[in-house]
């Protein structure tokens, strides 16, 4: 586990160039249940310049861009094989797209709207999916049937991958920004205000596990796991991630009793995530 760098280096840059500052985007609605566990094992080390600092850089056109270290994003190998252009797949029940597996029932359309509003001309291909967002988000409308994507599945996936192919670097950064601000940042703030737990100075892998649990369970659904972990500011980073992993492993079957087919997958994932961090 590598220690977090505490200072922003002067002249911190990305492979992106930003303009005037505006207000950050609001957080997304939470998912009430986690997505299907993935058995992905590979990780992409990043499509744009990585720095040692993880956090918000600046806000542009309603998007609070961030820089996130590979250490903090370690968990994405269990989400998408570390693929910013990930399409619908069996592992997520054909419900999610992208690096952080934005679920079409919850966060996919809000993310597309944010990317489209950031640059409507460049990301015009997202408009078709946004216009049919209510249908795409409707759980009764399948994205995959009879061995192939449905019409709606094609509309959503083609729009997403078309946007990625238009500007892989920027569209990847947009995914990072949305996921960080809508999931990780919400839980970091709640841990401090709700439980008195400050993780701002902890190792990025600790933050990554917090993000992982939030990404899987939603900003509301994750909170039980943090409560059950009996966290303390006096814990070492090693003790902290061990408590988090054990909380998921020991309680996920009870919390999500209606989804027994995924219990062992979730338990194994967080056992492996603990190994990643240690």
Which residue stretches match the model-derived regions?
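Bacterial Sec-dependent N-terminal signal peptides
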Residues: 1-9
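Hydrophobic helical h-region of N-terminal Sec-dependent signal peptides
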Residues: 8-16
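Intrinsically disordered, low-complexity serine/threonine-rich segments
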Residues: 9, 20-21, 75
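Cysteine-nucleophile amide-bond enzymes
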Residues: 12, 25, 30
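C-terminal segment of classical bacterial N-terminal signal peptides
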Residues: 17-25
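Cell-wall polysaccharide-cleaving catalytic domain and substrate-binding groove, primarily
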Residues: 28-197, 205-278
